[in-house]
């Protein structure tokens, strides 16, 4: 049923329809240069923004705020809270936004390298991370309500379906976690893990090209089963 849900968006390049941000803005890669924002996940977000705007004609807002820095020190303890407050304000000011992407990179054992080949280029593999506001130990996490759990899952499933058709080795799957991760902000909200700390900047940037393609396919409503 997730594949049959209509998540298409009527494109209007005159208004912002996609929002990209980074709860963990300091995430970097194997060959990142210290102090160079373009070598972090924020730089990857810049590249994704450019692809979506120049190749596919969407208007994108990219928030580059450092929600995981406090007084110049890395502190992720309240990053999701800080991000939520900022994103809610942006959404209120831009009601045309339909898609919200929290772009991260994963953390894996140092010997693991999440890479494949796409169009002859080394490309970091991707993972969708979905929060269920539910844990085995306590059941529903009532203080983290999310009215869009099913829509969030449908969005991830449809993206994964498109990936399986066009880039079968690109995706690592969908990871189901117990909390909310600010996915309650929109039905088409996504937490995307692009590669990991063992990938190069180039590999992760390369992954944005196929991701932008499958995102556009889902938003167009094309090639959907059923």
Map each language-model feature to its residues.
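Non-catalytic propeptide/linker segments at domain boundaries
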Residues: 1-22, 30
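Catalytic-core regions of hydrolytic enzymes
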Residues: 33-48, 52-115
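Active-site-adjacent mobile loop/cap segments within catalytic or ligand-binding domains
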Residues: 170-226
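A short, glycine/acidic-enriched catalytic loop
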Residues: 109-145
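Solvent-exposed loop/turn segments at secondary-structure junctions
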Residues: 25-28, 66-70, 105-110, 132-136, ...
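Active-site-adjacent substrate-binding region
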Residues: 148-175
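Soluble periplasmic/extracytoplasmic beta-strand elements of cell-envelope proteins
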Residues: 17-22, 99-104, 127-129, 191-193
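Soluble non-cytosolic domains of exported or imported proteins
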Residues: 35-43, 74-81, 146-154, 198-206
